[in-house]
């Protein structure tokens, strides 16, 4: 099946019932677009008794069809959900996997309900509620604390093809002097500002070294893209979705990415400090800082832009801080 909103209700019902994912007495009322999917095609099936979320990967990035992407990524995401949901402490944060069609690269998830992600915190003076921020840290802390046996780690996909694609946008593309992306179309003056970092050979060397670590294996199960777009608030509860970039790697990666987004969203410094304090554990704070710096740089001068409400001067201050975190923590 090729997933789209144009599929008839009867065809969708037949497909889901043939797979035993809907009961014979259930009906499909309509199909909806649940949100803006970057990587995959996502459809909400609204039924008379319950709703389902269908998610299908294609051989390209859904938002940028010109960018090839490994079609197997949906299977990796499914394995993350299966592994993480086996842990009672994490189950409450995640959607349940209803079914998986390997041939169609399609996964069916329970619909957590109509909510909103946390990208609203990028707007001016929109602090994240204390209980939600605490839940975001708790999920990461519990996930990273899990100790899996060597057989489980070996059997889990390395997700290397998707990581290599991501590596390009994290560690390479933002630092290319002529990558075809005019940052002045995002904000006048940003292109000239970015050139400071695109031409900094010492910084680029440190970033390249970080990229090698990103592509290496580790022993901690990571979400892989832990930022406000992967967090949902549904029925006053914090949820986590979209772990398609997951892999076993260094815990510092997820934490550094999270801190970077809180900083770009201009969350209070005291809240950022609370995140580190609550997470606790034995982590390499210098490495966390480097990942934080990398994520800030790639989001401001790279392709994957955010809805930041920052002046050019505020972005300049963030870029300076990010570069310092990368070079001084090496």
Across the structure, where does each feature detected by a protein language model lie?
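Protein kinase catalytic-loop region centered on the HRD/HxD motif
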Residues: 146, 211-220
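Active-site catalytic-loop/activation-segment of kinase and kinase-like phosphoryl-transfer enzymes
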Residues: 1-8, 155-210, 301
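Catalytic-loop signature of eukaryotic-like protein kinases
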Residues: 225, 229-231
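ATP-binding pocket architecture of kinase catalytic cores
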Residues: 44-155
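ATP-binding glycine-rich phosphate-binding loop
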Residues: 25-47
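Active-site activation/catalytic loop segments of kinase-like enzymes and analogous catalytic loops
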Residues: 79, 252-283, 292-311
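Active-site Asp-x-Gly
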Residues: 64-66, 73, 219-221, 232-273
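Juxta-kinase regulatory segment immediately upstream of eukaryotic protein kinase catalytic domains
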Residues: 1-30
